[in-house]
């Protein structure tokens, strides 16, 4: 079935993902309610989102909904089931989905590192300028100021003495 996703949201009681879409055959706006079963405050949001997106009943409807958005909706549901307020859950999701430039990525485990890398890849794709963009300039020339006094680093002066 051909459809265009318009909005995707979550209902807490009873838990369900709600998709508002436009049917391309008749052009009508419709609503699809996909119940969330066997999900608790200890469930993995990524796994639940993948299972819902790959479910044969809902697959054709969720093609245009990103996996990241479904994960976020499941995170809201998990926060609700844990007893957190909506503001607390939003703050927690914001912390998880942003990259701290001062954070040492060498200290993260493999799962967290993969998550951070996927966030960085997504940000790169979003900010990347493509040839078709209206503000795209092919050859940018930048002139750097020429200071008379160049600052040298300690290891530069040490290696210069060796030669």
Curated annotation (Swiss-Prot):
Cited InterPro entries: CEP19 (IPR029412)
Record's signal peptide: none
Coiled coil stretches, renumbered: none
Recorded superkingdom: Eukaryota
Record keyword Cytoplasm present: yes
Keywords: Cell projection, Cilium, Cilium biogenesis/degradation, Cytoplasm, Cytoskeleton, Obesity
GO cellular component: centriole; centrosome; ciliary basal body; cilium; cytosol; nucleoplasm; spindle pole
Pfam families to which the protein is assigned, alphabetical: CEP19
Localization per record: Cytoplasm, Cytoskeleton, Microtubule organizing center, Centrosome, Centriole; Cytoplasm, Cytoskeleton, Spindle pole; Cytoplasm, Cytoskeleton, Cilium basal body
GO biological process, one term: cilium assembly
Principal subcellular localization: cytoplasm
Summary of the function given for this chain in its UniProt record: Required for ciliation. Recruits the RABL2B GTPase to the ciliary base to initiate ciliation. After specifically capturing the activated GTP-bound RABL2B, the CEP19-RABL2B complex binds intraflagellar transport (IFT) complex B from the large pool pre-docked at the base of the cilium and thus triggers its entry into the cilia. Involved in the early steps in cilia formation by recruiting the ciliary vesicles (CVs) to the distal end of the mother centriole where they fuse to initiate cilium assembly. Involved in microtubule (MT) anchoring to the centrosomes.
Family from the record: Belongs to the CEP19 family.
Subunit comment: Interacts with CEP43; this interaction is required for its localization to the mother centriole. Interacts (via residues 121-150) with RABL2B. Interacts (via C-terminus) with CEP350; this interaction is required for its localization to the mother centriole.
Associated disorder: Morbid obesity and spermatogenic failure: An autosomal recessive morbid obesity syndrome characterized by hypertension, fatty liver disease, insulin resistance, and decreased sperm counts. Variable clinical manifestations are early coronary artery disease with myocardial infarction before 45 years of age, type II diabetes mellitus, and intellectual disability. Morbid obese individuals are defined as having a BMI greater than 40.
Protein name as catalogued: Centrosomal protein of 19 kDa
């Amino acid at each position: 079935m051909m459809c265009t996703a318009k909005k995707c949201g979550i209902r807490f009681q009873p838990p369900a993902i709600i998709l508002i879409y436009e049917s391309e055959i008749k052009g009508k706006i419709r609503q699809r309610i996909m119940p969330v079963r066997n999900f608790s405050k200890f469930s993995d949001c990524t796994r639940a989102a993948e299972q819902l997106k790959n479910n044969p009943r809902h697959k054709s409807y969720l093609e245009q909904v990103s996996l990241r958005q479904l994960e976020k909706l499941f995170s809201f549901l998990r926060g609700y089931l844990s007893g957190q307020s909506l503001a607390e859950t939003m703050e927690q999701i914001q912390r998880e989905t942003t990259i701290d430039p001062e954070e040492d990525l060498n200290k993260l485990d493999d799962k967290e590192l993969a998550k951070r890398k996927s966030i960085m890849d997504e940000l790169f794709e979003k900010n990347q300028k493509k040839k078709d963009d209206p503000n795209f300039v092919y050859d940018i020339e930048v002139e750097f100021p020429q200071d008379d006094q160049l600052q040298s680093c300690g290891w530069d002066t040490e290696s210069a003495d060796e030669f």
